[in-house]
Amino acid sequence: MKNVCKVIFLAIALGMGVSMCAQSNQESEKPVITSPPKSLNLDPFYKKYMNVNGIPVCSSWRVPDSCFHAAYITFKALTDMLPKKVLKSLVDNGARVTIMARYEGTTDVPEHAYLANDTTLNWDLRARGLGGTLRMPLSSCAEENILAYQIDKYHAENIAIHEFAHTIHNVGIAPIEPGFNDELRKALDAALAEGKYKNVYAGTNIQEYWAEGVQSWFNVNAEVDKDYGDGKHNMVNTRE
């Protein structure tokens, strides 16, 4: 985790610092939930909307307001931490978030409906969230994970943070910091050379190394009591 922490420290140097006071204030704040503004030109699927520091967060009518309240705390904290230029990059590149209701699947999201044509993988079983890219700057997450339902298959993790970390990386940082991916690659290569992240998701590529690292930084990653991993996780799940 030391190597990925170094990269996260780089992000912090860019302005991504943690403010516990701000987080405390966010918990007392309540988001304004409305219908999506017409200016977003969203699919009629979307009935609920809130704005978090310029980032639209939307869902169908099925997602309860309580989920928006919980999501607001997370996304407000994450976006408050970002340097202004990274947040501006996210907003300028059209970053958005969608929350899937408990009984909605990935392919119910209009922007991800095309994945139903993938004959190699059932995306409704595979994913309860996807990260954004410049081509598709939409990050998705799920009601049951945000509200920590017992039925959440990712109950030990915060997938909203993981997927939005992808969006911060791909849509916010990479377009304005050309050397950032090189730093990630060096950090991942060094970790793998030291025998770390074998047989874990974080070792897949720089994208997952970053997103899993951000999860661990915020202490919202899963832990498996195996140094050699189980294919997804090992004993590394905090910034320590």
Where are the regions that the model predicts?
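Short, mixed-charge aromatic SLiMs
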Residues: 96-101, 193-194, 232-240
